[in-house]
Curated annotation (Swiss-Prot):
GO biological process, alphabetically ordered: DNA repair; DNA replication; negative regulation of DNA-templated transcription; proteolysis; SOS response
Domain of life according to the entry: Bacteria
Site location (Cleavage): 88-89
Protein name per UniProt: LexA repressor
Role played: Represses a number of genes involved in the response to DNA damage (SOS response), including recA and lexA. In the presence of single-stranded DNA, RecA interacts with LexA causing an autocatalytic cleavage which disrupts the DNA-binding part of LexA, leading to derepression of the SOS regulon and eventually DNA repair.
UniProt cross-references to Pfam families, sorted A to Z: LexA_DNA_bind (PF01726), Peptidase_S24 (PF00717)
Binding partners and assembly: Homodimer.
Gene name linked to the record: lexA
Length: 207
């Protein structure tokens, strides 16, 4: 089975839950209602995408004509955790920071992604990182000037372009409306580089 987008995984999970609780798959209208789609046509498009990726089989002519395919032999990855708010002094991948796990193959990114981070705001819009994107992050402390990094200051996580001059860190936005964040490592002890950006998922599509 080809990797699913976050939204496609939501639809597949709903199909499985419905089968477990009722013994039958949901209709397109039920999928739309439960997942907040505007119409049954939107549900149909997601089902077609799942079918193309080998997750389900659509049986023509039946409102509940959906069969989930057994892909257990092809399950070679566990997905990527989505990190939410973090607490100062705790590892970013601590269990209490994980909001969800998305069925995304870490090896699709180079270097390999270790977690996802939801982007808020438009401070990096000039390099195509937009509000609502899921940023794929490779965990590393080995970073170079000019790389887009995920940095943590106290309990705030930010995505910026790195510039280091001695003990001074400049975290540059890619939007002229935002000033750089300046960190003096001799004064700010609760500062960490958590990793580098290796890709994004936007609007439930691979970018």
């Amino acid at each position: 089975m080809r990797p699913l987008t976050a939204r496609q995984q939501e639809v597949l999970d709903l199909l499985k839950r419905h089968l477990e609780t009722t013994g039958m798959p949901p209709t397109r209208a039920e999928i739309s209602r439960e997942l907040g789609f505007k119409s049954a046509n939107a549900a149909e498009e997601h089902l077609k995408a799942l079918s193309r990726k080998g997750a389900i089989e659509i049986i023509p002519g039946a409102s509940r004509g959906i069969r989930i395919l057994d892909n257990s032999s092809n399950d070679e990855f566990d997905g990527l955790p989505l990190v939410g708010r973090v607490r100062a002094g705790e590892p970013i991948l601590a269990e209490q920071h994980i909001e969800a796990t998305y069925r995304v193959d870490a090896d699709m990114f180079k270097p390999q992604a270790d977690f996802l981070l939801k982007v808020y705001g438009l401070s990096m819009k000039n390099v195509g990182i937009l509000d609502g994107d899921l940023l794929a992050v490779h965990s590393t402390k080995d970073v170079r000037n000019g790389q887009i990094v995920v940095a943590r200051i106290e309990d705030e996580v930010t995505v910026k372009r790195l510039e280091k001059k001695g003990s001074i860190i400049y975290l540059h936005a890619e939007n002229e409306e935002f000033d750089p964040i300046v960190v003096n490592l001799e004064e700010q002890k609760n500062f960490e580089i958590e990793g580098i950006a290796v890709g994004i998922i936007r609007n439930n599509a691979w970018m």
